[in-house]
Amino acid sequence: MFENITAAPADPILGLADLFRADDRPGKINLGIGVYKDETGKTPVLTSVKKAEQYLLENETTKNYLGIDGIPEFARCTQELLFGKGSALINDKRARTAQTPGGTGALRIAADFLAKNTPVKRVWVSNPSWPNHKSVFNAAGLEVREYAYYDAENHTLDFEALQASLSEAQAGDVVLFHGCCHNPTGIDPTLEQWQVLAELSVEKGWLPLFDFAYQGFARGLEEDAEGLRAFAALHKELIVASSYSKNFGLYNERVGACTLVAADAETVDRAFSQMKSAIRANYSNPPAHGASIVATILSNDALRAIWEQELTDMRQRIQRMRQLFVNTLQEKGANRDFSFIIKQNGMFSFSGLTKDQVLRLREEFGVYAVASGRVNVAGMTPDNMAPLCEAIVAVL
């Protein structure tokens, strides 16, 4: 039965990590997978996380199963981070949150819930977007359509083309937005543009689905939620898939959340019971450790202050690397202007490198980037910057 199965193609991002591990060149540089690295090239465990783990180690009393939707305190903290403390939406009990295995788990639960319980058939995703979006929605039986996003010539958001392509989206379609730090371009709508999209979305009858994986990495925790909150102020219904992989550095703990918002408490409770049913048929209930860390930090003022400072430090380091990257490319004689990279948000930069140039970087210089030209700025350090920029200039 199994002998006729053909091999699946390598994942465009995780497959790159396998190639990187197998490369024995000493100066190799990994700008592929989206993990934060410090000045020494390590992905550290945050001090706030270590302290929370110490607390849990000493105070945890059981390893019993969690409920289907996870830790209640985690859900409460998640909603406050997304919608703001004292938000009317929270006070009116219009939101319910399920703890999920990472942001990917949240997206899949949202997709399964929609496919089974609503007339939704189509999900609109930006072009370009995170490659796994299409796989997740297709796996749940939903059709994926693309809307225009990026102006490659000017390295900006093509807002007119975005609106024009979304004019084809019908009432009852899901439109996926990146909450901030758009992956892979690093280009986000302005607050005014978010406002326009929120109004358009209500007018057209779309269901907004926010993929929110980088809160705190663009401008700050509150600022990065402005787009989502503009939608939440106008929409009766929306879904948020959020992740704590990046902003808490909890990549391998798989900590995510799927938050459902409806018109009133009774409706959201009824709908959420079906979301829990989708979870039960998938992984039954989530693991406790990562979400316990998040809930411990967010509900303790001292730990939260440490975490917020660490998040600020990570964000500022990435911004410094953007500036250094642009300056070093110029110093090394790059024959094109890369200053647009400074304006992008989050870990990634859409470099404008072609697939062939990316391949040459890997084969000739041991520099690993995604075929789309997306590079992880958080993988750059003062030590690897010169050889990296020399390699890029050589393939331009």
UniProtKB/Swiss-Prot annotation:
Q: Name one GO biological process term.
A: L-phenylalanine biosynthetic process from chorismate via phenylpyruvate
Top enzyme category: transferase
CDD domains named in the record: AAT_like
Gene3D superfamilies (UniProt xref): Aspartate Aminotransferase, domain 1, Type I PLP-dependent aspartate aminotransferase-like (Major domain)
Q: Which cofactor does it need?
A: pyridoxal 5'-phosphate
**Positions of modified residues (N6-(pyridoxal phosphate)lysine):** 246
**Stored InterPro entries:** Aminotransferase_I/II_large (IPR004839), Asp_trans (IPR000796), NHTrfase_class1_PyrdxlP-BS (IPR004838), PyrdxlP-dep_Trfase (IPR015424), PyrdxlP-dep_Trfase_major (IPR015421), PyrdxlP-dep_Trfase_small (IPR015422)
Give the domain of life.
Bacteria
- Keyword entries, A-Z: Aminotransferase, Cytoplasm, Pyridoxal phosphate, Transferase
Q: What is its main location?
A: cytoplasm
Localization: Cytoplasm
Q: Specify which residues bind L-aspartate according to the UniProt entry for this protein.
A: 34, 130, 183, 374
GO cellular component assignments: cytosol
Give the EC number: 2.6.1.1
**Gene Ontology MF terms in the entry:** identical protein binding; L-aspartate:2-oxoglutarate aminotransferase activity; L-tyrosine-2-oxoglutarate transaminase activity; pyridoxal phosphate binding
Task: Give the catalysed reaction(s), semicolon-separated.
Answer: L-aspartate + 2-oxoglutarate = oxaloacetate + L-glutamate
Please give the positions of the paired cysteines in each disulfide bond.
Answer: none
Please give the subunit comment from the record. Homodimer.
Q: Which family does it belong to?
A: Belongs to the class-I pyridoxal-phosphate-dependent aminotransferase family.
Write down the PANTHER family for this protein, in alphabetical order: ASPARTATE AMINOTRANSFERASE, ASPARTATE AMINOTRANSFERASE, MITOCHONDRIAL
Protein's recorded name: Aspartate aminotransferase
